[in-house]
Amino acid sequence: RAGYAGVQRSAAVWTGDNHSWWEHIDLLSTMLMSLGLSGVAFCGGDVGGFQLNAAPELYARWIAAASLTPFFRAHSALDTRDHEPWSFGTDVLEIARRYVGLRYRLMPYLYTLFSEAARTGAPVMRPLVWEFPRDPRVQNRSDSFLIGPSLLVAPVSRAGVQERSVYLPAGVWYDVWTGERTVSGDPARPENGGRIVACDAPVDRIPLF
């Protein structure tokens, strides 16, 4: 949570003592994108929050989002609930297993992105404007992020949600879970923007394209 010039060369950085609040899932995305743009590519936050006690639904949503960030770990303060995946019951454990498995399947892609970050300084976790600079609708958007150029992640940061809206910039997108193909806007005219789509988002599924 503290650093100095050159810290990105030798260490991972985390966001500091976050809390088990839904708002801190939103802050996770914003802070990590900012760190990436500042040259700190290997960054993350404590899954479930460091302070207070995470509820099962909050933990499930958090681990889904955090599994797709550069630095991924669960951690908590001494006087709070344990934040290991098996501490929240079998349903949450299965969700955690799903996203840990997804991260392992993405390891070759992540390795490539970290290699690029080491060589060029490009962030691993990117705001949409990094890849779509001509789209005016993504200039201040932080409710979703990219992992490299090819994976759009839209975390759920509200309790009880079963669906969320996701903005897809101009292009052809595929839902990772269903394979459904969506053509958003005109790929030849990205300055005209894409469109917002409604995505199913039960507790075990993070919108992912």
What residue ranges belong to the model's regions?
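Catalytic-domain carbohydrate-binding cleft regions of carbohydrate-active enzymes
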Residues: R1-P207
